[in-house]
Amino acid sequence: MIRILDTDFNLQAEIEPIYMEWTRRYYRGDSFTFKVPLNTYITSLNYVIFDNRVGVITKIVSYKDYLQVSGKEYGFSVNKRIVSPSTQTGAAETLQKYYVTANCITPTARKILNLSVESDQGRGTSTTLPARYQDLEELLVEIYQRTGLGWCIEYLSGMFIFTTIEGKDRTSTQNINPRAIFAEEYGNLEEVVVTDSINSYFNVVYMGGQGTGAGRTVEEVGTGTQNNRYELFADAKNLSTTTQIQDKGNEILNEYRETYQLAGTFRSTDSITYETDFFLGDIVTVKHDDYMLDLRLVEVKQIIDTKVTYEFTFGKEPNTINNALNKRLSLINSEVRI
C-alpha cells in the first residue's frame, strides 16, 4: 500500500499498485516505479509515501491498460542543489551535514521545505573536501567513496530528516557483530550476476593547478605506462601545494579503480532476514564459486508483484552513464567561469 499526497502534503489517496519497484541506495537517493489502473488520478510532483520513505513523482506514462509512474526520493535528488564554493575539513558525517545545511536549509531562497538534519555524531574518517558548484548529491557520493559513509532521508511526523548511515562489519572473519553470509548453496541468494569492469578505470591523472595557459602548473599523478596507461584530467586550481595536489590526485584515482560487483536475488531463510539480521550499507560475506568475498551491500531493490522479492547489489557504486558523466563534470567544474 502506498499513500499519495499533494504538494501541500495533504493525503489524496491510498493505492495498492499492480506492480512496484522501490530502490534504496547507500550512497545516493532512492528511486521508484509502479503501475496503477488507468483511471487512477495522479499527477507529477505528487508525493508518494512507502514505509518511512517519501518520493516525488517526476514521470507518468499512459499505456492501454495502466499508468506507469516513476520518480525519485524527496529532497535534493529532485530539487537539485549546486554546492556553493567552500573547503571543509572534518569527520565524514560532519561534512555531509555541513553541505546539506549550507545548501538546503540555511539559505531561505534555497531551503527545501520540511527538511532537517539529525544531530552530528562526528562519525567517519576525517577528510578535507573542496567543493565548487558540484551537484550536492554527487558531492555526498564523493564523501561515500572516500570514507564509506552513506546517507538517507527519513520521513517522520511530517518532517524529512537527513540521516547518516554507517554500515556495520558483518563479515565471516569478525567476531563483534552477528555475521551475514550469502551463498547460493545456503538458499539465500539466487540468480547471481558478477560484473568486473574497467569502463571507468583510470591510473594516471593530470592535475591542473594554479595559473593560466602555458603558465599553468600541471602535476602528473599515477604510474601507468604504454598500453596499461589510462589518462584523465582534473582541475586543482584551489590547491596550492604539490602535496595537496598529489593527495587529491590519488583520491581521484581511488575513485576510478576497476569496479567489481555482485548482484543477486535474496531469499529470506530461518537464519537470516533483511532489516533484522543485516541492513543496507553493511559489509557482508558473499560466497560465489570458489571465492569468499567481503563486499558492502550498496543497493536494495524491493519488488512487489504477486509476491515481495529483494534484489541486492554488493560492491561499489554502479557505473551507469549518468554516474560517469557526473564524475567527469565534477573534475572540470571549476573550469567554468561564472
Positions of PLM-derived features:
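Short, surface-exposed secondary-structure edge patches
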Residues: 35-41, 273-277
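Acidic, small/polar-enriched beta strand-loop surface segments
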Residues: 141, 170-258, 262-296, 305-308, ...
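Amphipathic, non-transmembrane alpha-helical segments in extracytoplasmic/periplasmic proteins
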Residues: 8, 15, 34, 71, ...
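Short beta-strand-centered interaction patches in the first periplasmic/extracellular domains
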Residues: 61-78, 113-202
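Solvent-exposed edge beta-strands and adjacent loop segments
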Residues: 1-27, 183-195
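Oligomerization/assembly interface segments of phage tail-like spikes and tubes
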Residues: 24-37, 65-77, 207, 256-270, ...
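Short beta-strand-centered aromatic/proline hotspots
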Residues: 54-61, 293-302
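Surface-exposed cap/loop segments at beta↔alpha junctions
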Residues: 37-118
